[in-house]
Amino acid sequence: ASCLVGSEMCIRDRVWGEPLIQHLVLDESEYFHPDWDHAARRVMSPPFRDKRHQDSLWAGLQSGSLSCVATDHCAFTTQQKRNGIGDFTKIPNGTGGLEDRMPVLWTQGVGTGRLTPNEFVAVTSTNIAKILNMYPRKGAVLVGSDADLVVWDPEAEKVISAGTQQSSIDYNVFEGISVKGLPRFTLSRGVVAVTEGCLLYTSPSPRDK
């Protein structure tokens, strides 16, 4: 698909590709796990594929034929997933991923040399702002931009676990994966909103009122 997107971009210049962070690091072996719950928690569309496909996705990000990395975050609980016991088609479709998108991408992208820090910023922020015609108000550090910023610590480390995540769901598809590179602070319109994982600020800014 990434090859087709690349060719279409050359012709129409209006075709965009977006892999999910889950597909960059997880593969179809997740569905063969002996624990039914483990497999069902990872049911999503498109489903995970053979691990060999991941090289093509990374190459698409490197070449620019794939523009941004998303999650399709759907926080279905294990109990909700169990609606599909006995009928696969009734398993709610989707997984979590929003909280871990950037640390996993930094670790597996920048940490392995697949992406540069600038490419990381592009596929997590700048490119989507441009696609949605929100640039340079969003996706840029410029005078007049909204100052929605993440202060990143490339040396900070953690092991991903459902027991310590912010999400209220009872599992994490990246459980046990070690990541190096974490957000320290998040600013919304120039005001510190999150620090070291703690939410500080929820009031709307004057522009939002």
Which role does the model predict for each range below?
Residues S7, H23-D27, F76-Q79, K130, ...:
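Flexible loop/turn segments at secondary-structure boundaries
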Residues S7-E8, R12-V69, G86:
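Histidine/acidic residue-rich metal-binding segments in metalloenzymes
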Residues E18, D72, L105, G190:
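Residue-level signal for inorganic ion chemistry
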Residues R42-R52, I91-G96, V173-I177:
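A short acidic, glycine-rich active-site loop
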Residues S56, P136-G139, L182:
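A structural connector/turn signal
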Residues N83-D87, V143-C198:
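C-terminal cap of metal-dependent C-N hydrolases
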